[in-house]
């Protein structure tokens, strides 16, 4: 992964336009996905006169740099005792991105969850399985650090057909 992006060059004007999205100014914890960052969003940014006529390779390189910069900013804000970062999900297949992230965060060890014996592609499924187990056991889960919830709660529900 990342071969296409690795053939392009990051375009600073485009990168600045991408970083102007209000999401990046939000304080953690935060989460997002395709509801905000999608082809329609990218097309709107690319239609801006400041960033017209960028090659597809350069768009890919710039998007990769955006991912790297935004992750690195959060990692560099962590306490100094955090030395290892475990990556999971589809992005772990992007060797170009992981190499950029490691270069941007030289004081952190950037590895996949494979180092813990957990396939990076399976971590989300494993997490949801654990959440389901907690629900079946009627055990509340405290996700305050991730969601800003003020108390632990039973997540999900069981509905018999």
Residue ranges and their predicted role:
Residues 69-153:
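Catalytic phosphate/nucleotide-handling subdomain of diverse soluble enzymes
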Residues 1-68, 72, 151-161:
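Conserved ATP-utilizing enzyme core subdomain
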């Amino acid at each position: 992964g990342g071969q296409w992006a690795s053939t392009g060059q990051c375009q600073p004007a485009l990168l600045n336009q991408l970083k102007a999205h209000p999401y990046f100014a939000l304080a953690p914890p935060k989460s997002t996905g395709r509801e905000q960052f999608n082809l329609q969003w990218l097309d709107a940014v690319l239609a801006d006169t400041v960033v017209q006529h960028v090659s597809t390779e350069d768009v890919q390189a710039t998007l990769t740099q955006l991912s790297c910069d935004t992750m690195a900013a959060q990692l560099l804000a962590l306490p100094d005792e955090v030395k290892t970062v475990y990556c999971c999900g589809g992005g772990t297949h992007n060797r170009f991105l992981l190499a950029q992230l490691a270069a941007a965060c030289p004081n952190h060890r950037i590895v996949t969850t494979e180092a813990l014996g957990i396939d990076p592609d399976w971590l989300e499924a494993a997490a949801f399985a654990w959440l389901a187990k907690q629900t079946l056991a009627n055990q509340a889960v405290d996700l305050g650090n991730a969601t800003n919830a003020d108390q632990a709660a039973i997540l999900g529900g069981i509905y018999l057909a």
